[in-house]
Amino acid sequence: MKLTCVLIVAVLVLTACQFTAAISQTQRLSKKCIEDNHACGLLHHSPYCCNGTCFIVCIP
């Protein structure tokens, strides 16, 4: 009985992880990146910049 419960919980956790990973990948693929020298915000590693580096503008 305990083993069955553990297996059910493990399957549910793995399913949830796969589901969130799929949603994350879909969102990442659907966003268009900001071209170099266009405004992106403050200093941070931006997923919206095509090259990923942001310092007020996307740095080439």
UniProtKB/Swiss-Prot annotation:
Disulfide bond annotation, renumbered to this chain: C33-C50, C40-C54, C49-C58
From which organism does this entry originate? Californiconus californicus (California cone)
Q: What does this protein do?
A: Probable neurotoxin.
Its Gene Ontology cellular component terms are: extracellular region
| Signal peptide location | 1-22
Name of the protein in its database record: Conotoxin Cal6.29
Family indicated by similarity? Belongs to the conotoxin O1 superfamily.
- Which keywords belong to this entry? Disulfide bond, Knottin, Neurotoxin, Secreted, Signal, Toxin
